[in-house]
């Protein structure tokens, strides 16, 4: 089964407000939207010692299992369900449990490098980059990693200076050139509202298209005796 899906990619630096924008879109669309966090597709490093996993560079494109992500997005766009991996940020390993995700009208891929893979970009209908001042982003990163993910402040700061900041400059910020829309100041309410209106318009158009397609199919196959 193929369903008309509208795929959105939301990228930006750590702490830029990507998740907020993604959640506002999915909440606005409701059950017709699926959120795919890129973080869930980190390579599984469970075969390595904890210290090595803790010091790995998670902001480099090679940290992600792109082939699996491509396969999953393609499946969703083809109307097939997927088993999405889950990631343990405290232990830096992929969890054994997976979450079954069904295809929906809107698919939202969110993550620092959501716009970095050429094949994935070709699957997306709308490319968004969330841009926020670096000072604001590091404060949000600290709050998220220390409060939400249970990490030590010193480790978070060391990681930011050694990998997060240089990787942002080298790999993440350049993906802005792929963006159809750049949202300034993180979750800028005006920009997000306009974005939500666009998504709603796209989904309404897809619903109408699907209804016309179903009617055409019924007319073509109806053969009264």
UniProtKB/Swiss-Prot annotation:
UniProt keyword annotations, A-Z: ATP-binding, Cytoplasm, Kinase, Nucleotide-binding, Transferase
GO molecular function: ATP binding; cytidine kinase activity; uridine kinase activity
GO biological process, one term: CTP salvage
EC number(s) given by UniProt: 2.7.1.48
Enzyme class of the recorded protein, top EC level: transferase
InterPro entries reported for this sequence: P-loop_NTPase (IPR027417), PRK/URK (IPR006083), Uridine_kinase (IPR026008), Uridine_kinase-like (IPR000764)
Entry's localization field: Cytoplasm
PANTHER family hit by this protein: URIDINE KINASE
Family: Belongs to the uridine kinase family.
Official protein name in the record: Uridine kinase
Organism name: Halobacterium salinarum (strain ATCC 700922 / JCM 11081 / NRC-1) (Halobacterium halobium)
Primary gene name: udk
């Amino acid at each position: 089964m193929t369903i008309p899906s509208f795929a959105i990619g939301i990228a930006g630096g750590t702490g830029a407000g990507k998740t907020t924008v993604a959640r506002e879109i999915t909440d606005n669309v409701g059950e017709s939207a699926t959120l795919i966090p890129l973080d869930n597709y980190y390579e599984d490093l469970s075969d390595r010692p904890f210290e090595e996993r803790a010091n790995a560079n998670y902001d480099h494109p090679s940290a992600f299992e792109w082939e699996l992500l491509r396969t999953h997005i393609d499946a969703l766009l083809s109307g097939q369900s997927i088993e999405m991996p889950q990631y343990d940020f405290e232990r830096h390993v992929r969890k054994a449990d997976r979450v079954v995700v069904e295809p929906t009208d809107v698919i939202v891929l969110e993550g620092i490098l959501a716009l970095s893979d050429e094949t994935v970009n070709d699957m997306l209908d709308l490319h968004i980059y969330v841009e926020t001042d670096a000072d604001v982003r590091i404060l949000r990163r600290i709050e998220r990693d220390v409060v939400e993910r249970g990490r030590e402040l010193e480790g978070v700061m060391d990681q930011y200076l050694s990998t997060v900041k240089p990787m942002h400059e080298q790999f993440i910020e350049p993906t802005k050139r792929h963006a159809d829309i750049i949202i300034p100041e993180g979750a800028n309410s005006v920009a997000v509202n306009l974005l939500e209106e666009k998504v709603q318009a796209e989904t309404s158009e897809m619903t109408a298209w699907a209804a016309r397609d179903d009617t055409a199919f019924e007319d073509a196959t109806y053969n009264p005796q």
